[in-house]
């Protein structure tokens, strides 16, 4: 591990020199490329340097233990205990930082939420999830943009697609893909019985145009009048757009903007993200079957998380974590939940490396 870290530190120092080279400074494209590469190494280099400082401190404390002065020995013993604990903490952090990085981690995300089992109640729950992720994004200082929405009569969503733009958005939200289940008394239920409904969530990294080149000849583009809740036509111009990617059969519709051009741009962003995800799945056969089961049919039996309103709890079934603060979670306070999923994923990766 130390050898790897020393190579990284050496590369970091080389980049520092390059960034002050007048020739590089004049070439902004090269300078930005080097600056981005160095920024990606800063945390691991800072942690490694702190680790080396702790190792030096341990050597110094052990030398003090050999002194004849009892007070110095006691001071050194206390310091040594603290330094050894810090050493273990930094070693663990360095192991995590050395794990292979998901190339999509720093990307923006497109979140697709679809109502599953449960009719209108499932559509209302899809709306709850949309607001939960939007509020989480607000807490992070990220930007959200509604790309597409298919409303129901009472304010829910049959489907809603949102773009979240922010540094590391995909790394934080990628484990949200799957079936989310809700248990509560529906607003439409007069007898007070608890119902179970489901909604599916798919989290896709946003694809840049350079990553996914779409041949215009492989697209069928249909335009139609956009409709609002209940299916009524909200304008008489054909501003809504449906794009079909003929080779894959992927279909994307967008009707939220009054401008056909803007709807087309939004639909293309979603299409590129879905094509990138398809390419990733084909490269990783396991991921393909994993996403199919995660997105699935929205059936209540294939769940990753349950939101239980009567008990005020949220349970993530993959890691066995239950939190009794459903209200704050639905208000976007997701850090504890997401961090636990990231930590579990890192621990599993570390096991495979041992």
From Swiss-Prot:
Methylated by PrmC. Methylation increases the termination efficiency of RF1. GO terms for molecular function: translation release factor activity, codon specific. InterPro entries: PCRF, Pep_chain_release_fac_I, Pep_chain_release_fac_I_sf, Prokaryotic/Mito_RF, RF-1. Pfam families: PCRF, RF-1. GO terms for cellular component: cytoplasm. Keywords: Cytoplasm, Methylation, Protein biosynthesis. It comes from the Bacteria. Its main location: cytoplasm. It is found in: Cytoplasm. Residues 282-301 are annotated as: Disordered. The modification N5-methylglutamine is found at residue 232. Gene3D superfamilies: 3.30.160.20, 3.30.70.1660, 6.10.140.1950. Coiled coil: none annotated. The keyword Protein biosynthesis applies. Belongs to the prokaryotic/mitochondrial release factor family. Peptide chain release factor 1 directs the termination of translation in response to the peptide chain termination codons UAG and UAA. This is Peptide chain release factor 1. The gene is prfA.
